[in-house]
Amino acid sequence: MKNLLVAQSGGPSAAINATITGVIDAGIESGRVGHVYGALNGIKGVLNENFVNLDEVCDTKEKRDLLAITPAAALGSCRWKLGDPKENAEEFEEIIRILRKNDIGYFIYTGGNDSMDTVYKLSVYCEEHNIDDIKVMGAPKTIDNDLGETDHCLSLIHI
């Protein structure tokens, strides 16, 4: 079974931790995920291979319920933007190498505009390089009501 890695970036909010909790629950309950890891401090945590085993740290429903209602960003955050993969392929190659080294087949990144840009660039890189053993997904959230082109967004209700 492949492992799942979740990371968060951008502004902290209570909804961002609730998302992490949902990812942990879904990973555990799916029966298709080996371990659920969290990258500390966003994509920088991925690049630095700074992971925590979330299904061990949050091994009870009570711990996950507390995380879900805890404000801030439990995994930490960053404001790092990935460059253009055509100009800086090394950064993308390193991310793929690290994900494969840790047997990660699912990467979920939650955050705002820059985070979704990271998801987009990494997804396109995987597609263009026929990387089909890693699925990259975004969980959009905003505290600024500035995230367009999505019908669902964490942290803020769009009216």
Where do the model's predicted regions map?
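N-terminal phosphate-binding or glycine-rich loops at protein starts, especially the Walker A/P-loop
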Residues: 1-51
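Short glycine-rich or small-residue beta-strand-to-loop segments that form or flank ligand, phosphate
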Residues: 3-13, 73-79, 105-111
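Gly-rich Lys/Arg/Thr-decorated short loops/hinges at beta-loop-alpha junctions or inter-strand turns
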Residues: 4-6, 67-80, 141-151
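Short, ordered loop/turn segments at secondary-structure junctions
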Residues: 9-11, 39-45, 79-80, 112-113, ...
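Short Gly/Thr/Asp-enriched flexible loops that form oxyanion-binding sites at enzyme active sites
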Residues: 19-23, 113-131
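Glycine-rich nucleotide/cofactor/substrate-binding loop typically near the N-terminus or early
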Residues: 33-102
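Short, acidic/small-residue loops that bind anionic groups at enzyme active sites
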Residues: 40, 125-153
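Conserved small/polar residues in nucleotide/adenosyl-binding loops
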Residues: 157-159
